[in-house]
Amino acid sequence: MSGIIATYLIHDDSHNLEKKAEQIALGLTIGSWTHLPHLLQEQLKQHKGNVLHVEELAEHEHTNSYLRKKVKRGIIKIEYPLLNFSPDLPAILTTTFGKLSLDGEVKLIDLTFSDELKKHFPGPKFGIDGIRNLLQVHDRPLLMSIFKGMIGRNIGYLKTQLRDQAIGGVDIVKDDEILFENALTPLTKRIVSGKEVLQSVYETYGHKTLYAVNVTGRTFDLKENAKRAVQAGADILLFNVFAYGLDVLQSLAEDDEIPVPIMAHPAVSGAYSASKLYGISSPLLLGKLLRYAGADFSLFPSPYGSVALEKEEALAISKYLTEDDVFFKKSFSVPSAGIHPGFVPFIIRDFGKDVVINAGGGIHGHPNGAQGGGKAFRTAIDATLQNKPLHEVDDINLHSALQIWGNPSHEVKL
């Protein structure tokens, strides 16, 4: 294979999956085939999309009801020659799913890149091992928390929040994705002030915390804004990838003057991936493509919290982020939304140690504040790695958290 193989879930009311697959393969490449003169067929053969696989799925009444017609469901695989497109994500996505995305009854499940094609993508600059080296934390999941309620607040408020989270043992604190450039907490000032706080905490408590700052602005200003952030001392860049595009992420990741990890936020991605019938699958969008384009971290809804993905989907995202690939470093999985300490055993059981446990309200909502919330999570992580049930741990911060949010994982064993 020298090009790319696209896997689709299709719904066909003509009940002829093979014909539908061939129509897609031709429609996204040379347009027609059977009526072409033999000589022209020979000339265009190397550009033709090829149907590799057609598999009929069981009938699904809910799908028929939603579409208001009876359809035949199937999985098809089509190979697109590398000759047809330039080796960049805009060209790849337009080739494999451009006008087809308007069908409304086709979902792009996966893209399998040839080795030749993979060479054109950077992958994570740091990856899991690089991030762990920055923090000197190698034996446990990382803990991340989020600034909350920063809109309309000043630098003093940010510094207080940051200090409390760092003292609580949080490894990474990230901006809220809706915190943009503003007069009260401008980008450079956030970074400089934040670094002062984190250095003070490190000198006092010996705990290192990294700050992920939200890089925003117009598309053609992003590189300059990212470089300003780096010059000010940014540890990590948070980036709302899907508000801009995967190719923009790649351009940031490939820039040698932006030598810091990039954290990809899933904001807007639901517009592409939420439907089970059409769009782009979450594992492909939030897993494989983010990793290839250069994300060191990928945030996505966990199977447990307030904005939940199905467990199978969440684990598939993580698989794409962390599976062995000689071309790319591994990216950190960051299952998010509604996470509290009682979920820690689930997260470690399902995602392993190479995961970032990300909490907002589960840290800030603790009775002892963000310090208590962070300590509760760290205690839960340590107990889980020792295979000790959380309810048996004698720790006031963890006990308080379990009283508030519950302990759904009390029977979980690693």
UniProtKB/Swiss-Prot annotation:
- Give yes or no: UniProt keyword Amino-acid biosynthesis: yes
Q: Which UniProt keywords apply?
A: Amino-acid biosynthesis, Isomerase, Magnesium, Metal-binding, Methionine biosynthesis
Name the enzyme group at the top EC level. isomerase
Enzyme Commission identifier(s): 5.3.2.5
Q: Report whether Metal-binding shows up as a keyword of the record.
A: yes
Check the record and name the InterPro entries matching this protein.
Diketo-Methiopentyl-P_enolase, RuBisCO, RuBisCO_lsu_C, RuBisCO_lsu_C_sf, RuBisCO_lsu_fd_N, RuBisCO_lsu_N_sf
Which residues, renumbered to this chain, carry the PTM N6-carboxylysine?
A: K174
Q: What is its cofactor?
A: Mg(2+)
Superkingdom to which the source organism belongs: Bacteria
Named in its record, the pathway it takes part in is:
Amino-acid biosynthesis; L-methionine biosynthesis via salvage pathway; L-methionine from S-methyl-5-thio-alpha-D-ribose 1-phosphate: step 3/6
Something else the entry says is: Has no RuBP-carboxylation activity.
Q: What does this protein do?
A: Catalyzes the enolization of 2,3-diketo-5-methylthiopentyl-1-phosphate (DK-MTP-1-P) into 2-hydroxy-3-keto-5-methylthiopentenyl-1-phosphate (HK-MTPenyl-1-P).
Under NCBIfam families, the record lists:
PRK09549.1, salvage_mtnW
Q: Which family does it belong to?
A: Belongs to the RuBisCO large chain family. Type IV subfamily.
- Extract the PANTHER family matched here: RIBULOSE BISPHOSPHATE CARBOXYLASE, RIBULOSE BISPHOSPHATE CARBOXYLASE LARGE CHAIN
Q: What is this protein called?
A: 2,3-diketo-5-methylthiopentyl-1-phosphate enolase
- Species source reads Bacillus cereus (strain AH820)
The gene from which this protein is expressed is mtnW
